[in-house]
Amino acid sequence: MAKEEFAREKPHVNVGTIGHVDHGKTTLTAAITKVLAERVGGAAEQTFEAIDNAPEERERGITIATSHVEYETENRHYAHVDCPGHADYVKNMVTGAAQMDGAILVVGSDDGPMPQTREHILLARQVGVPYLVVFMNKTDLVDDAELLELVEMEVRELLTEYEFPGDEVPVVRGSALQALESSEEHEEKIMELMEAVDEYIPTPERDVEKPFLMPVEDIFSITGRGTVVTGRIERGRVQLQDEIEIVGMQEEKMDSVVTGIEMFNKTLEEGEAGDNAGILLRGIEKEEVKRGMVLAEPGTVTPHKEFECEVYVLSKEEGGRHTPFFDGYQPQFYFRTTDVTGSIELPEGVEMVMPGDNATFEGSLIEPVALEEGLRFAIREGGHTVGAGVVTDILD
């Protein structure tokens, strides 16, 4: 009897290409899939045209064009996102539609850093893309070695300016187009780039390993048994008899113990990240719990009202506002499972925010929510989405 082929489970990492328009992000993405398909195998090559023709997705009421490709190195399996337009990058990074554990910053060696290079680095810093690796593309168009040195220096300084370790970030030079056209020299550069990505971007901690958190979606009372809270477990694991805290929508936390876990009407010993579960809580009345609260491992989350955020405001064409908003604007902030009213304070020197803009400002909620850096939210008016954002700092 033939033995089953040994399939090693490689660790999975999410990455993407970022950088200025026409510096070669999509060409590089295609080149990576081609070179790795030929040299490592595992996933098929994707053409430039297939990647460039990005399908549209909806995330938090926003339409975003994104291409997803996958490829493998000897050590890892990668999911890679590439966006056709600048606005798609902004939306993608702000909504977290495509979570990135690290990104490849593509800089045209002929141009050097350009306005969107800077903007993408800033966005990566704001929304928490923790690691960047640089690919200096189009080196075949530059004869002057000193010019290449200068571009690398500029990129490193720019990274340092936005609090990335500019001196340590790996920088690889090559031509994605030449690699696509099977130039041995430039294929080697793609391999060198992927070695840098393998080594420099750490494997992320899986959601299951993080402290338990489940947003409350629904609450039921079961006669003789107590209160059941349902929701999708966002991270971590929960087991019978675990102590948990109920946090949000009020200043005080409540304590309880898990006395039952159900999924699809079957009882479980434990629930984990991604499960839609019903959790039976000891000593809690149905009236005490409401949507917008979270169940969490004790001591891991706290309720807050004041925060700083990075936000993308929908354009009129995307179904957003037709007019700008000003300091003191009061929308609903939709965190996890509920809307909370809040007001915004624009930074000094910013008069207003136009539809289609991305902006940084401070938000202030009327009720506390289990906020943390990196938490995504929608901004809504009368039940429809006018913006999407991410918490970049807690202020209270």
From Swiss-Prot:
Residues 10-205 form the tr-type G domain. Keywords: Cytoplasm, Elongation factor, GTP-binding, Hydrolase, Magnesium, Metal-binding, Nucleotide-binding, Protein biosynthesis. Its EC number is 3.6.5.3. It catalyses: GTP + H2O = GDP + phosphate + H(+). Belongs to the TRAFAC class translation factor GTPase superfamily. Classic translation factor GTPase family. EF-Tu/EF-1A subfamily. It is an enzyme of class 3 (hydrolase). This is Elongation factor Tu. Pfam families: GTP_EFTU, GTP_EFTU_D2, GTP_EFTU_D3.
